[in-house]
Design a protein with these regions (language model features):
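Conserved Walker A/P-loop ATP-binding site and its immediately adjacent core
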Residues: 1-29, 101
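Conserved acidic residues
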Residues: 62, 87, 112, 132-134
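Conserved interdomain linker/interface between the two RecA-like ATPase lobes of SF2 helicase motors
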Residues: 133-167
Length: 167
């Protein structure tokens, strides 16, 4: 299984959540036993030099998390070798998938089950994201359930140079 994210920060956040099983491991929910084995999560933080190196890395992991910039910079044969090691591909921030770099990578995984996540299901350029919507959490429902709080904006940068040393 591979998870592709757009940034290093998300790669770190997602890999930590997967490694710890996130909310699944919260004892108050009783979803899994404390003794359950946790997945071996690999963080692909550099480009493998060959398909063999990529495969060797993938074989040591249950889940690999990487960024689009890393996997997108690999040659097609290495991408396909990685895809052949994956039962599933999870794409975070999937509204980016119509972009050329993302669609090339996604094409390498065409024989893999792909699950895409996005909170931005519409693009300004009207390019379709593709796929079938299997879950939708409307903004109105999120607002009604209190997931949005009032924003108290405090600027970090003062544009008026006479006030730049004051808060």
């Amino acid at each position: 299984t591979m998870i592709i994210v757009p940034t290093d920060a998300l790669r770190t956040q997602i890999s930590n959540k997967v490694a710890s099983l996130g909310l699944l491991s919260n004892s108050q929910f009783g979803l899994i036993k404390e003794t359950v084995l946790k997945p071996i999560v690999g963080v692909m933080s550099h480009r493998p030099c060959s398909a063999e190196e990529a495969i060797a890395f993938m074989e040591q992991c249950n889940v690999v998390v990487t960024t689009i910039s890393i996997i997108g910079s690999l040659s097609k044969p290495i991408q396909v070798a990685i895809a052949n090691q994956c039962s599933h591909l999870f794409v975070d921030e999937a509204h980016h998938t119509p972009a050329r770099s993302w669609s090339i990578v996604k094409d390498s995984f065409k024989n893999t089950k792909i699950l895409q996540f996005t909170a931005t299901p519409f693009r300004n350029d009207d390019k379709p994201i593709g796929g079938k919507i299997i879950f939708n959490y409307p903004l109105r429902k999120a607002q009604d359930e209190g997931y949005f709080k009032p924003i108290n904006y405090i600027p970090i940068i003062e544009w008026n140079s006479k006030q730049s040393d004051q808060i």
